[in-house]
Curated annotation (Swiss-Prot):
GO terms for cellular component: cytosol; extracellular region. This is Secreted protein ARB_01864. It is found in: Secreted. One of its GO terms (biological process) is nucleotide catabolic process. Keywords: Glycoprotein, Secreted, Signal. It comes from Arthroderma benhamiae (strain ATCC MYA-4681 / CBS 112371). Gene3D superfamilies: 3.60.21.10, 5'-Nucleotidase, C-terminal domain. It holds the Pfam family NadN_nucleosid_C. The keyword Ribosomal protein does not apply. Disulfide bonds: none annotated. The lineage of its organism: Eukaryota, Fungi, Dikarya, Ascomycota, Pezizomycotina. Glycans are attached at N160, N216, N342, N405, N594, N600, N662. It comes from the Eukaryota. Induction: Expression is up-regulated in presence of human keratinocytes.
Amino acid sequence: MRFSTLVSLAAWAAAALACDSCSEPGKPAEHKRLVRRMQPEALGALTKPKGPLEWGQINFLHTTDTHGWLEGHLKEQNYGADWGDYSSFVKHMRQKADRLRVDLLLIDCGDLHDGNGLSDSTSPNGVISNEIFSRVDYDLLSIGNHELYVTDVAYETFANFSKVYGERYVTSNVQIINKETGEYEYIGSKYRYFTTKHGLKVMAFGVLFDFTGNSNVSKVIKAADLVQESWFIDAVKTPKPVDLFIIFGHTPARTDDKFPTLRTLRQKIQELRPGVPIQAFGGHNHVRDFVVYDETSTALGSGRYCETLGWLSMTGINSRTFRGSMKPRGVPNPTRRAIKGNATTSTQPYQHPRKGLDLRYARRYLDWNRLTFAYHASKSQDRQFDTQKGLKITHDITDARKQLNTSTVLGCVPETYCMSCVPFEAKNNIYQLVIDMLAKVVVKEDRADKPRLLLLNTGGVRFDLVKGPFTKDDEYIVYPFKNQFQYLPDVPYSIAKELLDALNKGPYQRRSEEYSPMAPQLSTNEVCANPSPEFVQLKRREAPQPYRPITRRTIDSSMLYPGYVTSDDFGLDGDDTPHSKIPYFKVPIDIQANASFPTNGSMPTVVDLAFVDYIGAKYVIPALNKLGGKYSASDIQSYKDFGSSSFLREYALEFWQEGLPNCTTN
């Protein structure tokens, strides 16, 4: 009942956001055609997994940074499963765990929206997608920074989503002001102590990195302060038996001085309870990664955007109450000790951290598609794979997308544009397209004749753009942030012309505490595949899978198709499906367009300097002043606010109408 009500309310709100008719501005568009949607018509994966998963004493399925991608990837073959397919897979895997007499836990590390039309077409974001997400029965969940930027979203998470999961939604260092009492309280539980189905005693803490970009109704406690709090120390030192500590949350699995959260918790727990195994799960940086901390503690990171499902298995945990199988029969078992570079069963001398403790691990990164899920779910065929619950979720996703008009076609993209598969200067680089968009549609009408420079940070672009129908969904996917442009009028051109270079030599412009700009990458036959830009982390750990267009051709099953190629502390064999590597080219921090410059080739004396609001006061003003300007935030004025629309939509409605209504992908 709640889902149908939510969809109806969201559809009513979405109607106000519908685009104008392409031929008659001001008249709502009436595109009947929906682009190829997820669910049964989704593109099938080309390559099956390399072999069965290892099953241990305790096993984990791990998701993170789904960002609303519950429909799956409509145009990417390797990520074609939707949340209903995943739900069916979870049921099969839990049944398999029961047959093997082992434990299986589901863990999610937050960031549930901002990046897809299904999650971002509602107000607040996530009203529909959170309800669909919550139909999968997770054992542990944590909060992400994208749940805290906007006050309405934070309260939606607190009032509804957290209540669905109860004590399983763990927010050890995140609090919110209760509207009724005016006091801070934890959004979820502070910790969770529980016993697994087969008797393991587990203590779990769920954390967010030291985030400072939250709205003023919430509070994030720094990890260094958290571990000194009496309740945390008491929980770690509980007189109850603890066989395994789980520390998980929205923070990178691979720790450093910038993101020390998991390291801080691990070290404190080891100080108070030496010898007890610690398993960590991370997210936020959108990468596949497995990290060996020491002989009894490792961490798993499982990508982003419903592209990756992480798998981890462990064997060797000492427990007086465990009544399952340490080494289940009929399936491979974990064999690797927690030693960096341990690509095979270790034969080197090993110092047991605790008498009788010999932990063995296995990890795998699963591509998010039905072929992968069916293969690992006892090699089920499609008819056997689908569950009634999974089919209902699939149906509801399809219905919600229709009601929210996310498949409404706004234009026909003439070519495929990627973020980093080709050099920045190449015509098929998406930033060259965005530069053209800025020049043509971002204009203050009463100053249209004034020469202008327009700046945008590349981190705001989150996805590639494939040739074919451009939908409302694509609008959210490519650039999910609000489009408010500001400006400084009549800036001396002698200063303004130096600004782009100064910004690109300056600090990286993360969206508040964002780790780095990330986006799944696409390709066509004419454009090479590409990974996500990771300007800060130039030592890449993987390259995301590109979209391969719909074509009628013979598939060579022996080929390696482009996708993730991951290197982690266990080596190069973590990817469940083998892929070929993908090219990667760096991108600048900011891009610039110019418009209304003198037609005779001369340079203007002054220009209007426009920029997206995110970079204005924090980056543009300081950079201008270093170049000799004398500006303050109070000098910034509104230039153009696209409101519920976007510069992408405006561009599509004006320049991408050729080929409609029969626009096809490749």
